[in-house]
């Protein structure tokens, strides 16, 4: 099944700004997050689709490749043999363009030397709580990595032997191919651009010169980070080839849904049930915040759905000098499981309201005025 256009997935125009793309992704992520739709396969697919689209369009280089080449420009399966991670369209033509212009996508070659490639970037997905996002969080992660083989000390050759000059390219890493009037250089098919070959590979690393290991890294998550943001750890991606630089590690942050608060940028929203007596008579109520407790006064006659704004009780974002606000949406709660005495008191109260006329229930009067024509 063909992939949908990434801009179509997020519902934004092709010239959308980074903020518009981020806002569209946040809206879809909140709507389709698996934690909010635990039994919906359809929601899960929508969430994955939106996440993939955001990952591509929020990265300047990937977005440029996608705009020029479409899905082929960012498909990691279209790349040089053995490439992993963030390879793209240009990698598929690395050997050809690198040989002609002296530099491949993500790699280059010193004149007369072997092909040099930058290591692939790695991505690590991390879930944190809203509290950790608001206050900052230091943690450790374990990621797969590569280290020099301890048996051959990184040479790839069996102990007691050593790599030899490639007889096909004579150590150049490239061979010249001629066809008619054209002559181009290509990566040597025997040594794959290294300029050497290993007649007796190391049995431990199978000639690669490296072994897989798990590396522990310190990650400092800054206070105010938002869902979908990435933290870059330079040089902690996959190692380069033939002395090329290592790639980077990107830690992608995902914030778990909160039991009380819903985040909207630097602002927070929460639903607050209050007794109908407090709504009618007014009074002071206490609400939770990420920094502790806060209180505010509910005026007499507060209706269900009324929103109160507590300034500075939200989150201080990464690029903000002040914290956002907390919006408390009150829900007037109807009492249940009444005693006989309570029922009698409410009936007396109801009777006194009726005697007082519509001034006690202005919304009900307005509603009945609008619908009375249906009953005439």
Swiss-Prot record:
Cited PROSITE patterns: DNAJ_1, DNAJ_2, ZF_CR
GO molecular function terms listed in the Swiss-Prot or TrEMBL record: ATP binding; heat shock protein binding; unfolded protein binding; zinc ion binding
Gene Ontology CC entries for this record: cytoplasm
Record's subcellular location: Cytoplasm
Biological process terms in GO annotation: chaperone cofactor-dependent protein refolding; DNA replication; protein refolding; response to heat
Top-level taxonomic group: Bacteria
Cofactor list: Zn(2+)
Domain annotation J: ranges: 5-70
Residue windows of the CXXCXGXG motif repeats: 149-156, 166-173, 188-195, 202-209
Free-text cofactor note: Binds 2 Zn(2+) ions per monomer.
Domain notes: The J domain is necessary and sufficient to stimulate DnaK ATPase activity. Zinc center 1 plays an important role in the autonomous, DnaK-independent chaperone activity of DnaJ. Zinc center 2 is essential for interaction with DnaK and for DnaJ activity.
Primary role: Participates actively in the response to hyperosmotic and heat shock by preventing the aggregation of stress-denatured proteins and by disaggregating proteins, also in an autonomous, DnaK-independent fashion. Unfolded proteins bind initially to DnaJ; upon interaction with the DnaJ-bound protein, DnaK hydrolyzes its bound ATP, resulting in the formation of a stable complex. GrpE releases ADP from DnaK; ATP binding to DnaK triggers the release of the substrate protein, thus completing the reaction cycle.
Oligomer and partners: Homodimer.
Name of this protein: Chaperone protein DnaJ
High-level lineage: Bacteria, Pseudomonadati, Pseudomonadota, Betaproteobacteria, Burkholderiales
């Amino acid at each position: 099944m063909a992939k949908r256009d990434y801009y179509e997935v997020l519902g934004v125009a092709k010239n959308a700004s980074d903020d518009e793309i981020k806002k569209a992704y946040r809206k879809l992520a909140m709507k389709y997050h698996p934690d909010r739709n635990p039994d919906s396969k359809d929601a899960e697919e929508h969430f994955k689709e939106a996440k993939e689209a955001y990952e591509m369009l929020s990265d300047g280089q990937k977005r440029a490749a996608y705009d020029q080449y479409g899905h082929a420009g960012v498909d990691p399966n279209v790349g040089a043999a053995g490439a992993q991670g963030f390879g793209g369209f240009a990698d598929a033509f690395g050997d050809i363009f690198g040989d002609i212009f002296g530099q491949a996508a993500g790699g280059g070659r010193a004149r007369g030397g072997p092909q040099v490639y930058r290591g692939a970037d790695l991505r690590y997905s991390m879930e944190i709580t809203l509290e950790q996002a608001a206050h900052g969080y230091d943690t450790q992660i374990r990621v797969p990595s590569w280290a020099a083989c301890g048996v051959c000390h990184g040479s790839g050759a069996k102990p007691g032997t050593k790599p030899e000059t490639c007889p096909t390219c004579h150590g150049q890493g490239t061979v010249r191919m001629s066809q008619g009037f054209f002559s181009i250089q290509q990566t040597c098919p025997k040594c794959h651009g290294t300029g050497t070959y290993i007649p007796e590979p190391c049995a431990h690393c199978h000639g690669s010169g490296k072994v897989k290991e798990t590396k522990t890294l310190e990650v400092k998550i800054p206070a105010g980070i938002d869902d979908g943001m990435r933290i870059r750890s330079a040089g902690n991606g996959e190692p380069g080839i033939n002395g090329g630089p290592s790639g980077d590690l990107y830690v992608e942050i995902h914030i778990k849904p909160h039991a009380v608060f819903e985040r909207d940028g630097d602002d927070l929203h929460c639903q607050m049930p209050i007794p109908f007596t407090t709504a009618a008579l007014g009074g002071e109520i206490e609400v939770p915040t990420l920094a502790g407790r806060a209180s505010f006064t509910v005026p007499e006659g507060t209706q269900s759905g009324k929103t109160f704004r507590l300034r500075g009780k939200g989150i201080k974002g990464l690029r903000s000098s002040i914290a956002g606000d907390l919006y408390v949406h009150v829900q007037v709660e109807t009492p249940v499981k009444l005693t006989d005495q309570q029922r009698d008191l409410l009936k007396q109260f109801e009777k006194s309201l009726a005697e007082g006329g519509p001034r006690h229930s202005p919304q009900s009067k307005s509603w009945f005025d609008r619908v009375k024509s249906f009953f005439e």
